[in-house]
Design a protein with these regions (language model features):
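Amphipathic alpha-helical coiled-coil segments
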Residues: 78, 90-105, 129, 135-154, ...
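Short hydrophobic/aromatic segments of transmembrane alpha-helices and their interfaces
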Residues: 72-74, 237-239, 354-356
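Short flexible linkers and secondary-structure junctions
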Residues: 22-155, 161-162, 168, 175-185, ...
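Bacterial N-terminal signal peptides
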Residues: 6-17
Length: 434
């Protein structure tokens, strides 16, 4: 009976091996789409098209969406923390973090140790994503604030240039000689350039509002416009570069994650170590012991060499990441120093031009100052006023960049991960593993 059962089992196994899967799609490799490169030769005259004649002159153009009488007020703190909270990828990582917790509660100790470490790394990664989202939102916030402020001075410059053009037309109609240095074509070109800048600002306003709506988790609506509430006081407080560096090295998620991995690496957590190394470079962690009794028996002693290799790799990765972090934080800090100096220089230029316009206006009747000279001085002032706003916005963006490189934007909104594996001092151990 037993022999008959063995024979039947062997026969069925043989039939399965011989017959196998038909696999009808595996017989040949299909052809891929291909279009031959056959183009018609021709001689061309090289003359550019007359676009002025080809453009429709009486077509009705659709205006860009523009703000109505009311805006929606938006503060920097609301913008920052809403973007950090509503970051979709970070929230998906949070769900993965929860699933790891579920597995930890019901599986073996080895699996529990791996997933506990993996869960902590996911928590740090989620905070990093929230940090990046808050940074992107704050940059768009300050850029939008600068745009709204610059639009005011751009409108003043446009009106002033239009009045200059009207004065030239008036002098022509009255057959009065136009003062030297005043060219109608130059002024008209300047007016068209200013109007084109206004159109570009209107489009950029739509883009920045849409970007903010996406980042802070609001419905996308091109007819809804935000008004950023910004304190325009120029902050020229000296930057403590070393203090900023010390804070950043203590709070950056990438360094905390590597410290955690170096602290907890052992034979059980080698799979997590391979994944961390692969995140830095695809070839790292790609070589791992094969499964199976034969491989285990033949490579039992060789497999012991993996742990010190992974420790050395993690120590080298930590050193490289730390050096990169130092460079990023210091660069961001000195960018603030640069923007402070640029804003201060532009502020001085604004004060000088304001004094110049005021002086010309007061002495207009006494010294017979031409109105065209006053108009030009006003135009120069409006241009530098707009430049000052640009410099102040760049200063605020530089401050955001520093907080981003320090990894503090999400922490400021309360996203401080509580790690179950953190505790040992990895920096000293990282040095000893090199």
């Amino acid at each position: 009976m037993i022999l008959r059962l063995i024979a039947i089992t062997g026969f069925l196994a043989l039939v399965a091996v011989v017959s196998g899967c038909k696999c009808p799609s595996g017989g040949c490799v299909p052809r891929t789409p291909c279009v031959p490169c056959v183009l018609e030769p021709a001689e061309v005259d090289g003359q550019p098209p007359d676009l002025a004649a080809l453009t429709c002159a009486d077509c009705e153009l659709i205006p860009l969406p523009a703000p109505k009488e009311t805006y929606q007020l938006l503060s920097a703190n609301t913008c920052q923390c809403s973007a950090a909270t509503n970051a979709p990828v970070a929230n998906m990582v949070e769900l993965e973090h929860h699933w790891a917790r579920v597995v930890i509660e019901c599986d073996t100790n080895a699996v529990r140790e791996n997933y506990c470490l993996d869960r902590d790394l996911m928590a740090l990664h989620a905070v990093g994503i929230r940090n990046d989202s808050a940074s992107a939102a704050l940059k768009a916030f300050y850029q939008l604030a600068g745009l709204e402020a610059q639009e005011h001075f751009l409108q003043l410059a446009t009106d002033e240039t239009g009045r200059t053009l009207d004065r030239i037309d008036n002098l022509r109609e009255r057959a009065i000689t136009i003062p030297d240095g005043i060219d109608y074509g130059t002024v008209e070109s300047r007016l068209h350039e200013l109007k084109d800048q206004q159109l570009q600002l209107e489009f950029l306003r739509i883009q920045l509002n849409g970007q903010l709506q996406k980042l802070i988790g609001c419905p996308l609506d091109e007819t809804t416009f935000y008004w950023p509430q910004v304190d325009w006081q120029v902050d020229l407080t000296p930057v403590d570069v070393e203090g900023a560096l010390a804070l950043g090295l203590a709070t950056r998620g990438d360094l905390r994650g590597l410290e955690l991995m170096i602290c907890k690496i052992d034979k059980v957590t080698l799979p997590v170590a391979r994944a961390v190394l692969a995140y830095a470079d695809g070839t790292l962690g790609s070589v791992e012991p094969r499964d199976g009794l034969i491989h285990l028996a033949r490579c039992f002693h060789c497999n012991k060499s993996e742990l010190p290799i992974r420790c050395r790799q993690l120590a080298m990765l930590y050193s490289d990441t730390e050096n990169l972090a130092i460079a990023e934080i210091k660069s961001a800090a000195y960018k603030i120093v640069l923007q402070q100096q640029r804003a201060a220089n532009t502020q001085q230029t604004v004060e000088k031009l304001r004094g110049r316009v005021e002086e010309l206006t007061k002495t207009r009747d006494v010294e017979d100052v031409a109105i065209f000279e006053i108009s030009k001085a006003r135009g120069d002032l409006y241009q530098v006023e707009s430049k000052l706003i640009e410099q102040v916005v760049a200063l605020e963006v530089a401050k955001v960049d520093l907080r981003k490189t320090q990894g503090t934007l999400a922490l400021e909104c309360g996203f401080d991960p509580k790690l179950c594996c953190e505790g040992c001092r990895a920096r000293g151990r990282a040095g000893s593993l090199r």
